[in-house]
């Protein structure tokens, strides 16, 4: 039974019903419907912390989905899973791929900045201030791009940029 048919919570059930209605109303191909079903099942599994299942669904959605914009969100979600698993290098790869297809994803820039900032903090703990500074500068660049796309978001990042004199 597909995950989308066994949702337990109200929000997932509501989303599934609305999505199914839209798929019937909006003219789409069978392939697009299948891709969306895998994507939806991936989101459901991801929200429950079932990352392996989510990845399987996302990879299947990627195999079927041809629209670059839709693919960007699949890639972004794969990046989120790798971030959650502490696989930061892999996460960055997927965020980059998402941005190649959709450069208007401020959340991808933000997540890349968070990873770079984390790596900068790690470098400080290892006593490597030069590497730390490089990571922090990279984080600043990504946060600036995220803020340019969503100026009212990422207030903590904006404050960090001001405090560290990287807002220029």
Curated annotation (Swiss-Prot):
A GO cellular component entry from the record: chloroplast thylakoid membrane
Record keywords: Chloroplast, Membrane, Photosynthesis, Plastid, Repeat, Thylakoid, TPR repeat
Location of the protein in the cell: Plastid, Chloroplast thylakoid membrane
Domain of life: Eukaryota
Xref: Pfam families: TPR_1
InterPro entries assigned to the protein according to its UniProt record, in alphabetical order: PSI_Ycf3_assembly, TPR-like_helical_dom_sf, TPR_rpt, Ycf3/AcsC/BcsC/TPR_MFPF
GO biological process: photosynthesis
Membrane-related topology note: Peripheral membrane protein
Chief place where the protein resides: plastid
Extent of the TPR repeats: 35-68, 72-105, 120-153
Gene3D superfamilies linked to this entry: Tetratricopeptide repeat domain (1.25.40.10)
Annotated PROSITE patterns: TPR, TPR_REGION
Family affiliation: Belongs to the Ycf3 family.
Summary of the function given for this chain in its UniProt record: Essential for the assembly of the photosystem I (PSI) complex. May act as a chaperone-like factor to guide the assembly of the PSI subunits.
Protein name as it appears in the record: Photosystem I assembly protein Ycf3
Native source species: Physcomitrium patens
Lineage: Eukaryota, Viridiplantae, Streptophyta, Embryophyta, Bryophyta
